[in-house]
């Protein structure tokens, strides 16, 4: 367990607002314009939420995120980083994660019982992850032809929906998986 007050201070966040953890997609910036569009749409909810946006190594993505922050009246509610080494800590204070459905981030989100908004999955495994998570009521996949504002409105302003997604996440996640794997290995 993490000291949440300390995490809010560490990232200069308000404990009085909900936090969205937003992963931009890494150094290749796949789906950059769509990613920027979704982040821009999320900034419409800064009266209730604050966003920790991680651009990855992609300098153009990072600059696009900063350009969004520059247009905001309340730019303090949008924190932009290339990288953070405290992902589990930030997840512990987050209400929602927006990410590509790669294995590591999804595993961390499940372990933190976080509802997930899926963006820009790579065809193949990531699309299969997105379909699976959506079928379990854990995630909502914002597809290419979807209107992100409609989807975000339905989730961000619907605490019942967020609670349901969180509950479904905790039903699927096995917080003892490491222990279980070690037990299996030790029996061999």
Each PLM stretch: what is its role?
Residues 2-6, 11-93:
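Donor-nucleotide binding loops and adjacent catalytic segments primarily
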Residues 52, 81, 96-98, 117, ...:
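Hydrophobic/aromatic beta-strand patches that form the interior of the parallel beta-sheet core
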Residues 86-128:
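A donor-sugar binding/catalytic signature common to diverse glycosyltransferases
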Residues 113, 128-139:
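Acidic, glycine-centered active-site loop in nucleotide-sugar glycosyltransferases
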Residues 161-175:
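A short, well-ordered alpha-helix in the C-terminal region of glycosyltransferases
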């Amino acid at each position: 367990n993490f000291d949440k007050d300390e995490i809010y201070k560490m990232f200069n966040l308000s404990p009085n607002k909900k936090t969205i953890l937003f992963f931009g997609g890494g150094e290749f910036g796949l789906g950059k314009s769509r990613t920027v569009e979704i982040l821009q749409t999320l900034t419409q909810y800064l009266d209730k939420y604050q966003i920790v946006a991680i651009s990855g190594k992609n300098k153009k993505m990072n600059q696009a995120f900063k350009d969004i922050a520059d247009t905001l009246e309340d730019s303090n509610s949008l924190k932009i980083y290339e990288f953070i080494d405290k992902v589990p800590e930030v997840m512990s204070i987050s209400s929602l994660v927006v990410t590509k459905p790669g294995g590591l981030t999804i595993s961390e989100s499940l372990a933190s019982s976080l509802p997930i908004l899926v963006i820009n999955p790579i065809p193949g495994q990531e699309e299969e992850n997105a379909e699976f998570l959506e079928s379990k009521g854990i995630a909502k996949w914002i597809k290419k032809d979807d209107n992100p504002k409609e989807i975000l409105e339905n989730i961000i302003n619907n605490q019942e929906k967020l609670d349901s997604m969180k509950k479904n996440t905790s039903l699927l996640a096995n917080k003892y998986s490491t222990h279980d794997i070690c037990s299996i290995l030790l029996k061999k």
